[in-house]
């Protein structure tokens, strides 16, 4: 059977506010359990919530960034369910009247095509606490530090048709929220988590199949692997004549499998109703317009500028603008060397290679943008060639000093004196007279192949320091005799 995968994603982004959504408690990762709570977070009777206006501003910013309708009147609702880390017995969320309505994103895929993913809504809600199962014998600890932390839940339409497309969409959301400064995007710390709703249907069928939901996947790689794993599981069941059970599942990265957690609830099971402790949030057009006017440059806008200002390819511009930190690094380095293509090649090449090897973010690069740009200047002005520059960059990475200091200490400057290069070439031609005669007797096509031997001899004699841009034309001229 030829199956079509149907995917919708719910992305939970933790907003970078200083305090919680409905209390004055601080928001922070890694504090001692239950040290960042108030009576509101603990669900104590009579403790009333106070809405965080900064979270509202951030939600409206995001709405503008995804071309969405802004809910001029939004309502908080109680989502009722029981769980040990939810002391109130309900989660304050939004249902019928979210702060952000329908929007969309045009997602660039690896093959250069664009896919439009509709966004159903983005609503504000409070996070729950956290159950701690380690270090407790036969018991579960409850940490309510996370309780009432502001979340913006971004719900897509079921428009996604592959794991690659899903990851590209999540990366784009990640890029937008970090550019806006409304979320730090740290998936390892839970600042951004993804729920995957997935079903299969025969190719050409309009009706959706029965979906499962994979909860709280917290890395791009795991999102892709979880989708592939669940597609395979569902396809095996359907092809054996079985049926898919609507349920919530968990992805286990160590075993690379999804496993059942509980039956999947519908909205009716949560008995949503308007929260009596919070008034409807009513916005003015002036408020909405003022926020739109203060939006920073977004990833798609930055990519377009990189193409127009720096004549970069669409691919290079999209890669460099995919993260705000990488875009900033590129621009700072390019301000030093003033050669966008050279800077782009080195940021996406050597810098990215070492960052990946060391599993570092670009913000934690041992070589900052200024120093990186200074290295590129030495390539541009022919002080060193590209091959030597890689060795210098590695030395800079290892903390041996600046580019200039390393070049000087190791005697790596290129030979750019044409007289010295001519003398070096003459010595090599004298020592290889037979090869010179063969070269001069050969036709043009064969000469192009043979000249590499002489270039290699020059580079060997100069210990790689001869400037190739000077060697090649001088050598060609002297070989003619």
Curated annotation (Swiss-Prot):
Superkingdom of origin: Bacteria
Cite the GO molecular-function annotations of the record: asparaginyl-tRNA synthase (glutamine-hydrolyzing) activity; ATP binding; glutaminyl-tRNA synthase (glutamine-hydrolyzing) activity
**Gene Ontology BP annotations:** glutaminyl-tRNAGln biosynthesis via transamidation; translation
* InterPro entries hit by this protein: Asn/Gln-tRNA_amidoTrfase_suB/E, Asn/Gln-tRNA_Trfase_suB/E_cat, Asn/Gln_amidotransferase, Asn/Gln_tRNA_amidoTrase-B-like, GatB, GatB_C_1, GatB_Yqey_C_2, Gln-tRNA_amidoTrfase_suB_CS
Q: Which Pfam families match?
A: GatB_N, GatB_Yqey
The record lists the membrane-crossing segments as: none
Keyword entries, A-Z: ATP-binding, Ligase, Nucleotide-binding, Protein biosynthesis
Catalytic activity as recorded in UniProt = L-glutamyl-tRNA(Gln) + L-glutamine + ATP + H2O = L-glutaminyl-tRNA(Gln) + L-glutamate + ADP + phosphate + H(+); L-aspartyl-tRNA(Asn) + L-glutamine + ATP + H2O = L-asparaginyl-tRNA(Asn) + L-glutamate + ADP + phosphate + 2 H(+)
**Signal sequence annotation:** none
Report the enzyme's class at the first EC level: ligase
Q: Which PROSITE patterns match?
A: GATB (PS01234)
Q: What is its EC number?
A: 6.3.5.-
Outline the subunit composition.
Heterotrimer of A, B and C subunits.
The free-text function statement in the UniProt record for this protein reads: Allows the formation of correctly charged Asn-tRNA(Asn) or Gln-tRNA(Gln) through the transamidation of misacylated Asp-tRNA(Asn) or Glu-tRNA(Gln) in organisms which lack either or both of asparaginyl-tRNA or glutaminyl-tRNA synthetases. The reaction takes place in the presence of glutamine and ATP through an activated phospho-Asp-tRNA(Asn) or phospho-Glu-tRNA(Gln).
Family assignment from sequence similarity: Belongs to the GatB/GatE family. GatB subfamily.
What is the protein name for this chain?
Aspartyl/glutamyl-tRNA(Asn/Gln) amidotransferase subunit B
């Amino acid at each position: 059977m030829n199956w079509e995968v149907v995917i919708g994603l719910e992305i939970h982004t933790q907003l970078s506010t200083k305090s919680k959504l409905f209390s004055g408690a601080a928001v922070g990762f890694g504090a001692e359990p239950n040290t960042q709570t108030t009576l509101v977070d603990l669900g104590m009777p009579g403790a009333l919530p106070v809405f965080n206006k900064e979270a509202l501003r951030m939600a409206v910013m995001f709405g503008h960034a995804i071309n969405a309708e802004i809910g001029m009147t939004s309502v908080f609702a109680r989502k009722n369910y029981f769980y040990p880390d939810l002391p109130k017995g309900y989660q304050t969320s939004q249902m019928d009247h979210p702060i952000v309505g329908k929007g969309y994103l045009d997602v660039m895929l690896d093959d250069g095509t664009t896919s439009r993913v509709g966004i159903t809504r983005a609503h504000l809600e409070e996070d729950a606490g956290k159950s701690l199962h380690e270090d407790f014998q036969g018991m579960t600890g409850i940490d309510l530090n996370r309780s009432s932390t502001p979340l913006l839940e971004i719900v897509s339409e079921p428009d996604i048709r592959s794991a690659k497309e899903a990851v590209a969409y999540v990366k784009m959301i990640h890029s937008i929220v970090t550019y806006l400064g409304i979320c730090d995007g740290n998936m390892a710390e839970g600042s951004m988590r993804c729920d995957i709703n997935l079903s299969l249907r025969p190719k050409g069928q309009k009706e959706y199949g029965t979906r499962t939901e994979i909860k709280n996947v917290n890395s791009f790689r795991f999102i892709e692997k979880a989708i592939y794993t669940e597609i395979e599981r569902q396809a095996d069941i359907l092809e054996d004549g079985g049926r898919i059970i609507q349920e919530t599942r968990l992805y286990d990265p160590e075993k690379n499998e999804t496993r059942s957690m509980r039956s999947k609830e519908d909205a009716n099971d949560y008995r949503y109703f308007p929260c009596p402790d919070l008034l409807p949030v009513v916005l003015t057009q002036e408020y909405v317009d003022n926020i739109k006017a203060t939006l920073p440059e977004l990833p798609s806008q930055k990519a377009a500028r990189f193409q127009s200002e720096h004549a970069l390819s669409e691919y290079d511009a999209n890669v460099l603008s995919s993260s705000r930190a990488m875009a900033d690094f590129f621009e700072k380095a390019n301000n030093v060397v003033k050669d966008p293509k050279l800077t782009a090649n080195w940021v996406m090449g050597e810098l990215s290679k070492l960052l990946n090897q060391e599993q570092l973010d670009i913000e934690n690069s041992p070589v900052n943008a200024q120093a990186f740009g200074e290295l590129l200047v030495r390539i541009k002005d022919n002080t060193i060639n590209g091959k030597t520059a890689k060795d210098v960059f590695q030395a800079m990475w290892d903390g041996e000093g600046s580019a200039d200091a390393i070049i000087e200490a190791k005697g790596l400057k290129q030979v750019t004196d044409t007289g010295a290069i001519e003398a070096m070439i003459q010595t090599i031609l004298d020592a290889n007279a037979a090869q010179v005669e063969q070269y001069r007797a050969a036709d043009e096509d064969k000469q192009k192949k043979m000249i590499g031997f002489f270039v290699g001899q020059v580079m060997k004699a100069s210990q790689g320091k001869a400037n190739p841009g000077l060697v090649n034309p001088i050598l060609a001229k002297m070989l003619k005799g």
